[in-house]
Amino acid sequence: MSKKLETELYKAATLTFEDLGFLLPTPEIDEQQLNAQVEASVSVDFEGPFSGKLLVRVCGGLLPIIAANMLGEEDAPSKSLQYDALGEIANVICGNMLPGIAGSKDVFHVSSPKMAESIDLPPVAEVQVGLGLGRADLLLFVSKYPALAEE
């Protein structure tokens, strides 16, 4: 895996969770965060100079917290709104990560987020972000651009 890809993915994720989800990433993943169970996954596909998919999984009770923070609500919103919020997080992370990888002149088309299905390919980059008592796992898959996938 490329260190640059992981760095750009981590940077985009931490900024998005801070700015959009009002969550402060922890510098290290502790045991509780590491053992937190996956509660939801979404993915976004992208096409441009290279194509691929970003998968975002949240673990440890983060889904209702993220949605409530984004919507400015005290109580957890409906499951549908929780998944919409996570989809928006994935979309923003992807949109912020791609220029860091490819440069600001390249144009990408990012699809609407969807509930994630299993992916049989190995990711070209994978990072974990500690958030409160849980964590987010971010996996980047790339196709149609062999040089990037081999970095």
Question: Where do the PLM segments sit?
Answer:
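N-terminal auxiliary interaction/assembly segments of multi-subunit proteins
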Residues: 1-151
